């Protein structure tokens, strides 16, 4: 297995931070699995795929909703079938909304928690299952400095990212002895389409 080209799977991979991660891994010789809510035929998704192909990466692009168990089962099964290994999985997909804590609706809170926290858990779940089969792997959860310090008018995002950090620490302890390394990145504000909406 070590002689095969390595593979990275990235959720929210069509644009923004996901695309930046994909480009860096392609530059380092990885094949790339991109999962996104966008259809792979979308012009923005196609631009990313083209750039990765030009860097020499073989790309599998899959429309997948991280809030959907069937979608995520399908995503990981397709990735495994195509490449036969998952060296790195980056749980990058996420959303954000703004508002004072006391003004938020149930719907606003539940949407961010479902995508940013539960969607990350779902990504980690399937990543771990496949990595346990091969005996190694690295999972990287995209958290935020908001999950460390709190940020006014970002209560939902802060709650979710605090949860992601707890998930990361727990999973790292569960699988660290099994050859799987789990970490979180905590970037500050990044200029991406998510932050411009």
What are these model-predicted stretches?
Residues 100-101, 105-113:
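Substrate-binding pocket helix/loop in short-chain dehydrogenase/reductase
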Residues 144:
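Residue(s) in the substrate-gating loop at a strand-loop-helix junction
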